[in-house]
């Protein structure tokens, strides 16, 4: 189930890379291209016979052992956004960006195009248009995922959240504004084998 595997990816990417390691800061675009091409070449051998979910699983496995590094993207409210592709080190979000983009790509060129569509609103490389929150994937065009939380458990709870609000006057990430959004989640006490099986 395509929807569920995206949800599952978000969970495993955050716990699977939780231990920071020493990351390289000198990773070149040539090395990035070589790694992406190697992954695409390997998975393309099976592409015709693999479903989207199977491609995601195959590509994800190629990132096992990848060092964790936060803040690899370049851009802020005071600095021009640049497109970064650095699959040598990942955090929860860049891991998802890279895997989804590769799952839709057949070459370096199509991978870069997919990465722009995955990471940014309407494919425009801009800090304020970057999808900063995972729920952006299900809300902002182009949509990368669907929120299936309510489909997999009758015990889902939905709350109103003010994303990026630190307090009444401050933002966690300056320049993004406060984003009001309804967030659905499954309480830990309601996560049982039946729920987990629906994520497979």
Language-model-detected regions and their locations in the chain:
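Functionally constrained cores in energy, signaling, and assembly domains
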Residues: 12, 51, 100-103
């Amino acid at each position: 189930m395509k929807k569920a595997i995206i949800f599952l990816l978000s969970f495993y990417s955050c716990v699977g890379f939780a231990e920071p390691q020493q990351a390289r800061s000198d990773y070149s675009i040539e090395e990035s291209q070589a790694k992406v091409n190697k992954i695409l070449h390997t998975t393309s051998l099976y592409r015709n016979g693999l479903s989207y979910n199977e491609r995601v699983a195959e590509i994800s496995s190629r990132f096992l052992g990848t060092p964790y590094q936060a803040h690899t993207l370049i851009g802020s409210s005071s600095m021009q956004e640049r497109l970064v592709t650095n699959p040598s080190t990942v955090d929860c979000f860049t891991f998802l960006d890279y895997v989804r983009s590769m799952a839709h790509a057949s070459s370096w060129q199509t991978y870069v195009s997919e990465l722009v569509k995955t990471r940014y609103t309407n494919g425009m490389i801009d800090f304020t248009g970057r999808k900063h929150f995972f729920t952006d994937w299900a809300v902002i065009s182009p949509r990368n995922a669907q929120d299936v939380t309510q489909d997999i458990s009758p015990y889902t709870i939905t709350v109103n959240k003010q994303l990026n609000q630190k307090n009444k006057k401050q933002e966690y990430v300056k320049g993004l504004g406060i984003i009001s959004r309804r967030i659905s989640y499954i309480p830990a006490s309601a996560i049982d084998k039946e729920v987990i099986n629906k994520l497979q």
